[in-house]
Amino acid sequence: MASPFVEVPVDTPTGERVIKVTNPDRTYFAGLPEGRGRKIDLVEYYLAVADGVVRGLRERPTVLKRHPEGADGEAIYTKRVPNSRPPWIETATVHFPSGRSATELCPVDVAHVAWAVQMSTLDFHPWPSRRVDTESPDELRIDLDPMPGSGWAQVQEVALEVKVVFDGLGMTSFPKTSGSKGIHVYLRTRPGWTFTDLRHCALAVAREVERRRPDLATSKWWKEERGERVFLDFNRMARDQTIASAYSVRARPLATVSAPLAWEEVPDCEVADFDIWTMRDRYARLGDVHAAIDVVAHDLSPLLELYDRQGEGEAPYPPQFPKMEGEPLRVQPSRARRPTAT
């Protein structure tokens, strides 16, 4: 028997697309009442926030985080779009240090988003660079990740300290909830910088925030050194590392989303305030509160100068990376300190 389906018309700048949504009543979220959080609900949510979600994805190679068994099932990170894709689907080819390459989805309109949701995509993980030059990122991302023993209140405080650092350099930054436990802070950058440059900028911010608030924040890569603090994950700016885009639905029990915020909202908001229904209402009232994110693109020289002044040099890369130039020994400190047996 053929799977049930509905056809959803989607308006785009190049004409109407029709997305065939199979099994529209399939549910994804165990924490919701029966019949809530269906595939069709996801499609309708993304259509309702179309301009906002596309603003974060447009022309960016994008990894799809798919959950065909539901939000609590195993995630499938899809870097290669299927050959059976419609002819209008846009793609971008990216290359990895291993020498391999992948043809990734490159959304240019909300029909691309709806097509991906049909494949059980919940959230979208775009590169911080665009198709025209994938090796030149234009988006600095600061990822705040609370360690066990720290919580949302600490994340909020650290986010506001990140804002102080950027404000002090005359830079306009944009916060959003991660939709899970943390906060992401974005900054648009001028073209011409490398992934190494942006990672150094993220590392400079992390170290500066830790210097200001050592009780709350840490830039330490090794978990054993972080304590019960909020980790500013500078390695999210390493090449081929991504985070969930603005408006992405997260694989959480209550269908929470990564919610763009105005800075004045950060002290009083909660992650649970924003799900696929409340965000639709909010978007209808306020539109995209990050609509101005592309207005100003920043020169990163002040952040790179801060990195140099700090004088701490490189920090470890994630384990899947080859040894990088200037990187310290990639060994956790407790092991490095072990005395040699005699």
What are these regions (language model features)?
Residues L64-H67, S173-G179, K220-E224:
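Short beta-strand
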Residues R60-A92:
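Polyanion/phosphate-binding surface patch
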Residues I76, S84-W115:
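Class II aminoacyl-tRNA synthetase-like tRNA-binding/catalytic domains
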